[in-house]
Structures are given as C-alpha cells and as structure tokens.
Amino acid sequence: LYDLDKVISWTCSKFKNPEITLLGHSRGGGISMLKASSDTRIKNVVSWASPSNFLNRMPEDRINLWKEKGVVFVYNGRTKQNMPLYLQFYTDCIEHKEKLNMQKAVSNLSIPQLIIHGDSDPTVLVKEAKDLHKWNPKSELFILKDANHVFGAFHPYNIEKLPTDLQFVVDKTIFFINQ
C-alpha cells in the first residue's frame, strides 16, 4: 500500500486532476480495493480474480510451517515455479489486520467498482468475488463462464492476440472505465 501510494502521489504531481482507476489481478486486486477505499484520488477500482481475504486459504498446519521455516512455497502452474511467500506477508496481515480488512474496505467503497472472476478459477474461488459483491452491492460483478485464474493466459505468452477470455475481460474493463 505504501508503494502504491507513492505511485499515485507521483502521478498526481505530474498530471492535473488525473482520473485514476486502480486495476489489479489476484492479490493486486485486493491491494487496489484496499487503497481505493481510503484514497479520494481514486475514481474507479477494478479487480480481476481477487481474493476477499489474504489469509483465508492458508491451513493452520501450513501457517505453523511458515512460522517455523520463514517461507512457504506456492506452486505457479503457469510458470511451473515454486514461488516463495515469506513470513513477512503473514506477519504484516496479522499486525495490520484492521487496515487490511477487505470486507470493511469494500463495504466502505463509494466509487464505481468492477469485479471480474472466472467460474473455473482453482486459485481464488468464485465465492470470493461473490463475497466482495455482497459487501458492496453497488459494485458490478461479472463472472466469466469456464474462465480460469488468468483468463486463458499463460507464461511465457508469445502470441500477439490475447486469449478470448482475457480479451473479453480487457474490453469489459475498458467499457467500465469509460462509462
């Protein structure tokens, strides 16, 4: 959130009255929603396949291992890598529980919000998108049939045309921002 604030402040110092939309995918969408709820410079917020809680998918035994080792690894199916998730993330979430309360943040949003999620997302379940929408009934929720967590993209992506699902998500987002 600190880094995002610095980027927004820089943008506001370089452009007169910028119309800022925050857009984030997965955890980035969560960070965007948290920031948008507390920053009047933000005009819209869009989340793609974003969690409604940063820690709700971490079982207790995994948290204990995290505390013991200082790091857990999360497999990224697109890149085939085990991505490190350091204990600092967990301790930040615990120490700043109130500031990182997604339900409270989303409930307090007074700007336009678009939530997009695939109903075949194995990483962040579609229930989380429905929770976000429930907490802000004024939000626009769009659930894309048969779409996964990355809307058909993969890594490395070496094709000029976007996957059909991702192109639809991009088009929907642009339409939302331009309303």
How would you describe each model-predicted region?
Residues 15-26:
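Alpha/beta-hydrolase fold nucleophile elbow
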Residues 120-124, 149:
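Acidic catalytic loop of the alpha/beta-hydrolase fold
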Residues 111, 125-134:
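Short alpha-helix in the alpha/beta-hydrolase fold that links the catalytic acid
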Residues 40-88:
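Hydrolase active-site cap/lid region
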Residues 1-14:
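Alpha/beta-hydrolase active-site loop
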Residues 29-39:
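Short glycine-enriched nucleophile-adjacent loop
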Residues 108-109, 115-117, 121:
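Short beta-strand/loop motif that positions the catalytic acidic residue
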Residues 150-151, 155-179:
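Catalytic active-site module of serine/aspartate enzymes centered on a nucleophile-bearing elbow/loop
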